[in-house]
Amino acid sequence: MSAIPENANVTVLNKNEKKARELIGKLGLKQIPGIIRVTFRKKDNQIYAIEKPEVFRSAGGNYVVFGEAKVDNFTQKLAAAQQQAQASGIMPSNEDVATKSPEDIQADMQAAAEGSVNAAAEEDDEEGEVDAGDLNKDDIELVVQQTNVSKNQAIKALKAHNGDLVNAIMSLSK
């Protein structure tokens, strides 16, 4: 028996894994190359990670993953990444960041929401009533209900799309 060179990449399979691989060969599963990491998340947000897995796919779309599963602690990795970013100067430290109380943040969000609602209402008021022409009132109401826009905007969209309900609704819901 010859010796294994120092830099050789050798993996020793246990008996159960060897049997499983033989069965996979018989099932006709195809190996998917290029996958570096596989993670599984349970309901309680516990994460299992497999580094450098061997992944096989069946014809039905199911996957079989071989590798050593380890419990992954994401919060520790996040804290380490933040410390590294602060050390390199990419992210400011906690003392440099201006903090706001939750009440101030909610007040800012409320003011921004009121400003956008008022601006939209002013736009509709400035234009006045738009002539519906030969458009069906039921079509106009349907567009208003589906997109939560004003009647004037619904009429404009229907006119722009020659009375086509689907295209008018799609253009307003973007």
Curated annotation (Swiss-Prot):
Signal peptide: none
Function: Component of the nascent polypeptide-associated complex (NAC), a dynamic component of the ribosomal exit tunnel, protecting the emerging polypeptides from interaction with other cytoplasmic proteins to ensure appropriate nascent protein targeting. The NAC complex also promotes mitochondrial protein import by enhancing productive ribosome interactions with the outer mitochondrial membrane and blocks the inappropriate interaction of ribosomes translating non-secretory nascent polypeptides with translocation sites in the membrane of the endoplasmic reticulum.
Subunit structure, interactors included: Part of the nascent polypeptide-associated complex (NAC), consisting of EGD2 and either EGD1 or BTT1. NAC associates with ribosomes via EGD1 or BTT1, and with the CCR4-NOT complex.
Record GO terms (molecular function): phosphatidic acid binding; phosphatidylinositol-3,5-bisphosphate binding; phosphatidylinositol-3-phosphate binding; phosphatidylinositol-4-phosphate binding; unfolded protein binding
Region (Disordered): 85-137
Post-translational modification: Ubiquitinated by the NOT4 E3 ligase and the UBC4 E2 ubiquitin conjugation enzyme.
Protein name per the record: Nascent polypeptide-associated complex subunit alpha
Biased composition (Low complexity): 111-120
Species for this entry: Saccharomyces cerevisiae (strain ATCC 204508 / S288c) (Baker's yeast)
Family: Belongs to the NAC-alpha family.
Coiled coil: none
Lineage: Eukaryota, Fungi, Dikarya, Ascomycota, Saccharomycotina
InterPro entries attached to this UniProt entry: EGD2/NACA0like (IPR016641), NAC-like_UBA (IPR044034), NAC_A/B_dom_sf (IPR038187), Nas_poly-pep-assoc_cplx_dom (IPR002715), UBA-like_sf (IPR009060)
Sequence ranges of Acidic residues compositional bias: 121-132
Family matches, as PANTHER family: NASCENT POLYPEPTIDE ASSOCIATED COMPLEX ALPHA SUBUNIT-RELATED
